[in-house]
């Protein structure tokens, strides 16, 4: 079966340009139809899927998640404790001090990020409130002007001049005598 670039892009979850780039990286022979569109076979699709999945797995393995939780910190502490048993007490104290400073820094950074997020939300809420108050003022002004205006009388619909029926022209009396 033949597939076009947009279909494969949708399957892989990438852009059509990325599909062409992946095909070039895999050295696939890409055929074009009479309109200049790339045509891929089922084998090409399978190869690209395998390649794309392997790339995703690679990127996930090389880039661990940035979230740190208390469980992760505790796990690191236990790992450090096992290593420390083999190291002298002086080195152990240095490592624990470094670990404590790092955890404090992480906690501070998390608090700062949370504070910034809260500040952004607060600013957005205040902005929305201001906009709503401005809209309310405009509505009140419009209501006041409508109340001041005299009542509007609705006139019956009349057709515009260009749509009115034309009255037949009266023939001149002389023409009617001669039958013209």
UniProtKB/Swiss-Prot annotation:
Keyword Thylakoid part of the UniProt annotation: no
Single Gene Ontology MF annotation: double-stranded DNA binding
DNA-binding residues (ranges): 5-25
Annotated InterPro entries: Chrosome_anchoring_RacA
Matching Gene3D superfamilies: 1.10.1660.10
Gene Ontology CC terms, in alphabetical order: cytoplasm
Keywords tagged on the record: Cell cycle, Cell division, Chromosome partition, Coiled coil, Cytoplasm, DNA-binding, Sporulation
Major subcellular site: cytoplasm
GO biological process: asymmetric cell division; chromosome condensation; chromosome segregation; sporulation resulting in formation of a cellular spore
Coiled coil residues, start to end: 89-151
Location in the cell: Cytoplasm
Protein family: Belongs to the RacA family.
NCBIfam families: PRK13182.1-1
Function: Required for the formation of axial filaments and for anchoring the origin regions at the cell poles in sporulating cells, thus ensuring proper chromosome segregation in the prespore. Binds in a dispersed manner throughout the chromosome but preferentially to sites clustered in the origin portion of the chromosome, causing condensation of the chromosome and its remodeling into an elongated, anchored structure.
Protein known as: Chromosome-anchoring protein RacA
